[in-house]
Amino acid sequence: MAPAGILNGKLVSAQIRDRLKNQVTRMQEQVPGFTPGLAILQVGDRDDSNLYINVKLKAAEEIGIKATHIKLPRTSTESEVLKYVISLNEDASVHGFIVQLPLDSENSINTEAVINAIAPEKDVDGLTSVSAGKLARGDLNDCFIPCTPKGCLELIKEAGVQIAGRHAVVVGRSKIVGAPMHDLLLWNNATVTTCHSKTANLDKEVNKGDILVVATGQPEMVKGEWIKPGAVVIDCGINYVPDDTKPNGRKVVGDVAYDEAKERASFITPVPGGVGPMTVAMLMQSTVESAQRFLQKFKPGKWTIQYNKLNLKTPVPSDIAISRSCKPKLIGNLAREIGLLTEEVELYGETKAKVLLSALDRLKHQPDGKYVVVTGITPTPLGEGKSTTTIGLVQALGAHLRQNVFACVRQPSQGPTFGIKGGAAGGGYSQVIPMEEFNLHLTGDIHAITAANNLVAAAIDARIFHELTQTDKALFNRLVPSVNGIRKFSDIQIRRLRRLGIEKTDPTTLTDDEINRFARLDIDPETITWQRVLDTNDRFLRKITIGQSPTEKGHTRTAQFDISVASEIMAVLALTSSLEDMRERLGRMVVASSKKGEPISCEDLGVSGALTVLMKDAIKPNLMQTLEGTPVFVHAGPFANIAHGNSSIIADRIALKLVGPEGFVVTEAGFGADIGMEKFFNIKCRYSGLQPHVVVLVATVRALKMHGGGPTVTAGLPLPKAYTEEDLDLVEKGFSNLRKQIENARMFGVPVVVAVNVFKTDTDAELDLVSRLSREHGAFDAVKCTHWAEGGQGALALAQAVQRASQAPSSFQLLYDLKLSIEDKIRIIAQRIYGADDIELLPEAQNKAEIYTKQGFGNLPICMAKTHLSLSHNPEQKGVPTGFVLPIRDIRASVGAGFLYPLVGTMSTMPGLPTRPCFYDIDLDPETEQVNGLF
């Protein structure tokens, strides 16, 4: 018989490594920035372990796998090792890891406990009980196989032997080689016999094997004469035996007597150079397979989401009754369904979570989805249902059209919740749930804004007080205190010195003039624009006197409280793009001017770093869900008059990455299109760089009747008869407002879909008239929507229209160039969006325009603070007013947020409580902890 063919593990493993290298390259081409990750956890410092690990690290580097070696000292305890295992389980950059055995610790460590703590999806060594169980059951495509048996199988296949139907004999039953080898051969359809130290007539059993795998750890235990002629022999042994002819006095042999066996076998593995190289190659292959599974599971845009089925009732129950009738999914499950990693999500109970900005960094190379903004016509005081339409639309796109879709909405203030309006989370069968969580504390973002805002306010008045009561030297010495005889500037103080043009870092070298310039902000109290805030409607805080305590030595001034969401910090949160950007914006916020007319910022006050600390969690978007189980980001809620009235850029950007290129992100702009949409485009999109694909313009028959000359609509009172009976003439006259808002949206080059929000008193003739006129005057489409009563099903036609519109040509453009003068930018908005003949800058506004231009703020975008109840400055003028000049009473600056806001009329920034606030109905069931009466 001819000598056996040699199964060269070095050659086969080299071929496998080349194949893996190509696979890694292709993965990185498909997902830029992605690299398969392998970690090796070692306890102790055994020489043999160090050798094996170095071989693995080198192989990983050659293939393109990022390998990390974590080496723990011999003093490590079991709990310390387990902490590292858990950490690696949660590290998304590690797709597989192994615990190098044996564990070389001076403490007792349960190896089984450590191995079984490895997440099965990362168990690339295939040693956990879960992996072993799946292999034993034949779930070969859903588990990792121990590397040595896996390599042995590759070598058997390399021999060209058909495994199915052959008799295979495995000598050895270890958990690492023998037992899994038996299972692997069995599920490749061999008839398998496992032999071990207690097997009788071992030689005769071995002689039955067409395929023989030996893993006993006994040098040359299996003799050549035992082997069936023509068998394939796989020798897994590595043994050292004495050999005087070798320089080190020993040689390596396997578990099979090689020289004898090769005369009877058809193929045989040498030792070394057979199974050994294959073990390392299989570890690399399993790591690449794990990375591929990770990409498949977390591929952007590939969601495995389950939707909730609504149980619709007629008549439609109350919002809170509907909210409680639907059990929300666990928020952690929803996060996984939409492709978020465990370490990217911070759970706040079972129904809300924060999403870390690291998700955006992970997905930064992925294409964005389609971007949709929901706006409305000039509304009645009752509102026309933009929020409800937003939620109904995403439920239709997701639960009914099976599109990946995210809603991004503003977080409501608690003020209205306990005041007159009540909560806000959509309505009917189109809601964000749980409503109680949505409308109360949520995750504390508004509380963080309140704390940060009031820290600035406290810093302003304290600084004025201390400057008025101390000499330059005393003030400087307290600002730069001596610690152990040494004075040292803080980082923020060094930045102030740089802005002052003082290039010094040693406090002792400043001249008297430099000390004066550094220490004194010299704030002019009459110019302070920063107010304290509270998230409660409190009319008696609209104007207050502060500093009346004797300890303030008579330094009083008139001030006020605003509602928390009116704080510039809320606008900063909504417009920021990163932690670094937020830090810079918070520092740029201007709170007053000096007596020389120079702007005083939070950076000058030295408080910007502390503000960033207070806001570090608030910057993370809040994840919730709709009634039908689609995801919602609830993040930021700036005013829509003195601010831009849109949810956060960060939430939109993360959502656009998560939905994938075929998915949709639907966000809402506050008030009518002339205010919220205009600011969405000219401020939010300008800063984010994002380009919307579709505008959804919400209209109602009742609002059109109002604009057509219908009676006054008053919140809290029944609708006049004209609004509950058919009147086509009134609707057609009022269409002028909708026509103008369609025109406003198209001015930005984006397709417009009109969503006619249906009320039970609307007639088909009225609804058809609105739809027909909308299409005739430039809308891409106009559809009737019944999502309040029917959930996503009622917005199905709207969702289909949005899908079609998103494919239509668009040429997004901004309304004005930032380099224009402040006055010209205001004029463009007034004339083109509102239809004004011109603007009039009143003296205070003219003065502010000159000051801001001089201070370098003239190139900021414009955020008009105007009534939302009319296109003009007069809330009583409905339809499309003409022939008016828009009066600009004042101009103020939100420098940190990044806009100037001209005041058209008087803006209330602190609501008051009515005679009978909502809180009369609110209570808690002490047994169930259920909130009652909130809606």
Swiss-Prot record:
For whether the record's keyword set contains Chaperone, the answer is no
Q: Where does substrate bind?
A: Y52, I53, N54, V55, K56, V99, Q100, L101, P272, G273, G274, V275, G276
Q: What is this protein's record name?
A: C-1-tetrahydrofolate synthase, cytoplasmic
Q: Where in the cell is it found?
A: Cytoplasm
Please give the family membership noted in the entry.
In the N-terminal section; belongs to the tetrahydrofolate dehydrogenase/cyclohydrolase family. In the C-terminal section; belongs to the formate--tetrahydrofolate ligase family.
Kindly list the positions at which Phosphoserine occurs in this protein.
S318, S413, S490
Q: Which Gene3D superfamilies match?
A: Domain 2, N(10)-formyltetrahydrofolate synthetase, Formyltetrahydrofolate synthetase, domain 3, Leucine Dehydrogenase, chain A, domain 1, NAD(P)-binding Rossmann-like Domain, P-loop containing nucleotide triphosphate hydrolases
Q: Where does NADP(+) bind?
A: G172, R173, S174, S197
Q: Which UniProt keywords apply?
A: Acetylation, Amino-acid biosynthesis, ATP-binding, Cytoplasm, Histidine biosynthesis, Hydrolase, Ligase, Methionine biosynthesis, Multifunctional enzyme, NADP, Nucleotide-binding, One-carbon metabolism, Oxidoreductase, Phosphoprotein, Purine biosynthesis
Query: Which Gene Ontology terms describe the biological processes this protein takes part in?
Result: 10-formyltetrahydrofolate biosynthetic process; folic acid metabolic process; heart development; L-histidine biosynthetic process; methionine biosynthetic process; methionine metabolic process; neural tube closure; neutrophil homeostasis
- Ranges for the region named Formyltetrahydrofolate synthetase domain are 310-935
Residues bearing the modification N-acetylmethionine? M1
Any one GO MF term held by the record is: methylenetetrahydrofolate dehydrogenase (NADP+) activity
Name the active site residues. Answer: K56
Q: In which pathway does it act?
A: One-carbon metabolism; tetrahydrofolate interconversion
Q: Subunit structure of this entry? A: Homodimer.
List the source organism.
Mus musculus (Mouse)
Recorded coiled-coil stretches: none
